[in-house]
Amino acid sequence: MPDVRILEPFATPRTKLGFLLDWRVTMKCNYDCSYCSGHDNKQSHPDKELCENMLAQALRYVDRVMKVKKKTMRSVTLNIYGGEALYHPDIEYLLEKSSELYDQYRDRWSLIRMLTTNASSNEKRWANVLKHLEYVQFSYHAEGPGKLKENYLRNLSATHNSGKRYGGVIMMYP
């Protein structure tokens, strides 16, 4: 048996070995599903300036990593989630800031901002948020209230009509 000293992903012409940056912008959620332990509504939202500084620092770090990667592998996914990310009172500002902060790196590496969300926000907020995303991961919650499910469907339709990429997951128990 060969002596394996290192394990690396196998790259093919179709494989793009990117970089995943997880950004949990809040622990709070506007739902209280029986199957979810991923939120804490007792904990306050992180301060807007702290979030902005953390994002700026993370992008600087990513830029350093991207400098040593092959040009064809310089791709970053910023996974924005929470509790429920859209429940953060400053999420529109933070997403807009993500666009501004990324501008200085745009010519060096690509960024896909992916929001994982229950999509329960109102129409105006959704339109503002969508401007600063490349991908939306919709999380449908079977236990969610009816009105918020209507918002989910409306926001899913708006995302589809915008031409943005999206996917979905259905959350239920049992």
Can you name each region flagged by the protein language model?
Residues M1-D22, V68-T72:
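N-terminal [4Fe-4S]-dependent radical SAM core
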Residues M1-P13, Y35-S37, S110, L133-Y135:
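Short charge-dense sequence patches
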Residues F10-N53:
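Canonical Radical SAM [4Fe-4S] cluster-binding loop centered on the CxxxCxxC motif
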Residues L55-N79, H88-P174:
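Radical SAM/AdoMet-radical enzyme domain recognition
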Residues G82-G83:
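Active-site beta-strand/loop signature of hydrolases that rely on acidic residues for catalysis
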